[in-house]
Amino acid sequence: MSDPHNLTPFIRSVDDYPIPGIKFRDITSLLETPSAFATACGEMTALSAGFSPTAVIGIESRGFIFAGAIASRLSQPLVLARKPDKLPNASFSKAFDLEYGSTALEIQKNTQLSDQDRVIVVDDLIATGGTAVACAELLSEHFGVARQNILVLALIDLPNLGGSDAIRQGGFNVASLMAYT
């Protein structure tokens, strides 16, 4: 367990949720404690600032929580990566597998991103890396963002599930505040 910011007391572990064999990391206590949430957002913003981003991408749904705060603090645009059929305009889509199923992410085609951008992809947790890699590939393939100009940032990393390694192997950068091993 790596937790240099002392946020562990605000993360609950729930066994066998959403299916047997999965240990869910529940961040609601962190969100309900203003000082802990402020610390998390501040530290994630500090990690982001050194990357010099031009946009922040929030992954549905818990990634939205942190991405909005980070984008606001960095004065950068916030782009939403949503589940299928949640966006009103034509969208690019990328299917991927989760540790307990499969789905897709979508970003609107009219989003103002280009090959000149440096983006941060924000989510609450990295498990197998499927969600983050799908989002990063969507940005690279459809908006021309160079892989080395994409940073995947999460509150929590579960390195034993291989997600961070998968992100790095895809040519993307990765960082997190906490790691549960």
List the predicted regions and their residue ranges.
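Acidic, divalent-metal-coordinating active-site segment for phosphoryl/phosphodiester hydrolysis
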Residues: 123-133
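Active-site-facing substrate-recognition patch
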Residues: 1-53, 108-110
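Generic enzyme active-site microenvironment
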Residues: 58, 121-122
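Short Gly/Thr/Asp-enriched flexible loops that form oxyanion-binding sites at enzyme active sites
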Residues: 65-74, 136
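Short glycine-rich phosphate-binding loop at a beta-alpha junction
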Residues: 52-60, 150
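PRPP-dependent phosphoribosyltransferase catalytic core
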Residues: 9, 134-181
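Short, glycine/charge-rich flexible loops or terminal/linker lids adjacent to PRPP-binding catalytic cores
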Residues: 76-120
